[in-house]
Amino acid sequence: LYGDGNALVNLNVEQDIKKYIALSETNFSVSKDGGTVEVLVTGYGGDAKLYASPDYKSYGYLNMQWAKVTKGLLQAKLQITLDANQYSEERTAGIICYFLDDDDQLIAESDYIEVKQAGQGALTSTDMSRDGEVKKLQSHTKGNVGLPIVIMGDGFVDKQIASGYYDECMQIGLDNFFSEEPFKSLREYFDVWQVTTVSETNIMDGEHNTAINSYPTGEGTLITGDYQKVFGYGSNISELMESGLFPETTFLVMMNTDTYAGTCYFGFGNESGIVNLAVGYAPLIFSP
């Protein structure tokens, strides 16, 4: 450009490249037996790092792996693998991709990826012989008397018990319970028993019969169940009954569903007043 004095003026114009992430597809379906889907991820994040994260409910059964990642103008493939779905109902895994800079500041993020997985549907039991089986999972090593916990499941059919799935779920539920304080630091003070419950069906809707008839009501996080059946299964534990500590027992019921809900009932009492007896119902957020 020339001004009035014929002087040459230089103009430097810089344009930043927009940071973005685009996906080849955002909706997928996987069979109940599990499988892998692949998403082509393109975009630009400069020197930022690329990440992918599932929603909180998907951590237990979803694995992700990046393949063929190029820097600069990004081109990458995200492989998403789902384990077999042991629940009766369909479930949906959610994933999002994003760029973070060196200060962990969000630079860009993708649309939401949804992977729907079919459920097992209705299963029924034909062999009820293991219903009520008892085994001790842990004996206290501190304190004069162990604090009693009884863990059992609901909505598990005979095949899921025979395969070892029931035992795995009970162990995961127990480990999750003892992952929180103050129970984590006090675990050595507890005695823990497991009771096997065989349900007629895995459908937990209040209309089908399960061992404890627990089910999410659909009203917020409320779960209902037949605590008298819980106590009935607990009465199979001769050591617990002979100790006189049944009124001090915490019962944990692990439900064969990943529905987001959870309820604890407190305030049971006897002729002497309030006791420490409690029943807690919880879904299997993290299953094998």
Question: Where do the protein language model's features map onto the residues?
Answer:
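Catalytic zinc-binding patch centered on the HExxH motif and its immediate surroundings
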Residues: 203-204, 234-248, 255-274
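Short, solvent-exposed loop/turn segments enriched in Ser/Thr/Gly
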Residues: 33-39, 76, 86-95
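Surface-exposed binding patches on compact interaction domains or structured appendages
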Residues: 20-23, 45-79
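Short pre-active-site segment immediately N-terminal to the catalytic Zn-binding motif
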Residues: 160-169, 269-287
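A short beta-strand micro-motif common to beta-rich folds, especially ectodomain repeats
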Residues: 1-4, 78, 89-101
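Beta-sheet-dominated interaction scaffolds and their linkers
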Residues: 18-41
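C-terminal edge beta-strand
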Residues: 5-16, 106-120
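Propeptide-to-catalytic entry region of secreted or membrane-anchored zinc metalloproteases
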Residues: 121-246
